[in-house]
Amino acid sequence: MALVFDVQQASGKPDDNRRPGTACPFCNTEGLTNIIQRDGDCIWLENKFKTLRATRQTVLIESADHDADLVTYKPDELHHVMRFALDCWQQMIDSQQYRSVLMYKNKGPLSGGSLVHPHMQIVGLEQEDGYAALTSANFEGIDVWQRGRVAVNISTEPIMGFFEVNVSAPRGIAASDDARDQAETDLFADAIQVAPVSYTHLTLPTI
């Protein structure tokens, strides 16, 4: 089996990345439907444009600010966004309804993303193992920084690019009430913020 892309669904998507001036649906929060969870400005909802068959596609709006970005968030906002995102991702994993669950963020006009407004996507794959081609070697590399269980390295076995940075932390820490886990969740967010995101593949803790 393989993921099937539905071209018909994709044809109706708003795209202000390639067509500046297009109305942003994420700015009009009153018009949003099928909201799963909300915490402050963070909104997790069903993706209106289901372009991948045999999946559950959801979107996580990070901020009410259309021009905001992970690299510009103040510490409190950054930590809130990342905790919310990791918690939503963990919820889909814990549901055991999917063979695998992916969380990712497309950034920039060449990333394939259609909307500028800061957001991530969490996708449950019903039949596919999205991690099947990954090995522990993909998360290893030249050590750059480590504090506690949070580490940053330059990958020596990049997944899809010439230059990738791995930011790793123990899986499930965001859902824990333990003070150490919460502190390291914030460290994980801090490390992602300072990484050179224009040139990296940021690896969330998946294995």
Predicted segment positions?
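Active-site microenvironments that recognize anionic phosphate/pyrophosphate groups
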Residues: 1-115, 123-202
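Short "domain-exit" segments at the C-terminal end of structured domains
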Residues: 203-207
